[in-house]
Amino acid sequence: MRRLRILVLMHPDFMPPDSTSGYTPQQINVWKTEYDVVSTLRAAGHEVRPLGVQDELKPVRDAIEGFKPQVVFNLLEQFHGEVMYDHNVASYLQLMQVAYTGCNPRGLMLARGKDLSKTLVHYRRIAVPAFVVFPMRRKVKRPARLALPLIVKSLSEDGSKGISQASVVETDEK
């Protein structure tokens, strides 16, 4: 296998140390993914440079121009503290004409909207859980095709953010 120069983008809070020795499992859990990616790539013989990115693109540009990575491994899930800006980092990498891992900006934007992404996936005959979108502050009538219990989720929140026990609906009255 050819040795590559790989730039790994991550949130600065998740920059891993060179070794896990001396850390508790709870401490390791914070940056475990980033540590595993960096250490696995290094163990495979690649030249790896981790870079913490939060609010500025200049460090990314400087690393691309100075380190000249053959690929950027993008672990960023937000930029400038907003998960909705993740596609901008991928756009920047495209503009810099550097290969990168993960989805392209358009795919990241489409995936952000749960209703649209589920509709697109369903259209391609890929099974997805039944869902319906209800307008806010209006009376809700559950369609018969949706069996209880249900989980109420935000259309725009990332992953399971905002979901709690109160999000579980077990009766039509709730």
Describe the function of each predicted region:
Residues M1-Q27:
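A short, flexible N-terminal coil/short beta segment enriched in small residues
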